[in-house]
Structures are given as structure tokens and as C-alpha cells.
């Protein structure tokens, strides 16, 4: 039995073009879709198992990446965007029509990822953004209904796809968080 991770990666991870200049994210609405422009390529693209990230129907994981917040602009139908959970660290702006999360923003200037917006690269109209490179918060899929006994198969499938599974973020991102905290303590 094939383990389904996310439609964006289930048939193999497609490598990015290496020169993606950005594009337009489009929600799933047929009438007045929300459109968001993103300048430049994405960074830290990964499969995420947390229960906060938006997942398309049938997906076990989301696919999420970051871009500088100044590179994100709502182009059309921004009146349809609403923050999903105002108490969350990442303010996820979702379309009120279809529920698609268009971008997530951190407003806390003391947060290690302040200045980066979280986006779902599979929503790009254009092809070629950087490919997912790892899987984060893998065990968290249990919280969304995956049976614990399926985790071995899920981790094996992630590895087969070239997405190293972590139960937190990747080592590079965890190092960035620890560095930020250490600098803040030293200040």
C-alpha cells in the first residue's frame, strides 16, 4: 500500500528550476480567487505534519516554505482573507471562501523567524520553485488522526521521497533558532 504524503510530492519530488523569480499563489475558489504575489524563490521548503498548517483534501502533510515578508503582496480579493487563529504565533491568512491558507506572518519582532512569511508553494500558478527538502513535525500527524502504527511506513516513504523526517525542524533551522535565542540572552 502506498503511503500518501501530499499530492505535491506523492509522485516524486520535482526539483526546482534554480532560477525561480517568484509567482502568484492562487486559492481554490472558482469565483473571485485570492491571489498573492511572491517575489523570488522560496527557502526551507518542506513537508509539515503539524496540525496548524493547511493541507489539501487527502493530504497527511502540508507543504510549506518561507519567503521574506516584504516579498509578499496581496494582489486580488484580499477582502476574503481572515486570520485563522489570532492567538497563534504564525498569523495564518486564509480565504473565507475555500479555507486555503494563503500566507502566514509572524508579528512578534522577537521571534527567530520574524521577517519571514510562510507560504504553500503548490499554490503557485508557475512552476520551478525550490523543491521540498525535508519533513518536519512528523510525529504530529498522529494528532490529526494517523494511527501510531503507521509511522514506520510514513517515515520510510518520506525517506524514499528524499525528505528526511524530523520531529522538530531541520538541524539548520533548529540551529538558527538556538542562535537567535543565544544572541537575545547575551544582549
From Swiss-Prot:
InterPro entries: CENP-V/GFA (IPR006913), Formald_GSH (IPR014185), Mss4-like_sf (IPR011057). Its cofactor is Zn(2+). GO terms for molecular function: S-(hydroxymethyl)glutathione synthase activity; zinc ion binding. Zn(2+) 2 binds at residues 48, 50, 53. One of its GO terms (biological process) is formaldehyde catabolic process. It holds the Pfam family GFA. Pathway: One-carbon metabolism; formaldehyde degradation; formate from formaldehyde (glutathione route): step 1/3. It comes from the Bacteria. Residues 20-167 form the CENP-V/GFA domain. The keyword Zinc applies. Keywords: Lyase, Metal-binding, Zinc. Catalyzes the condensation of formaldehyde and glutathione to S-hydroxymethylglutathione. This is Glutathione-dependent formaldehyde-activating enzyme. It comes from Bradyrhizobium sp. (strain BTAi1 / ATCC BAA-1182).
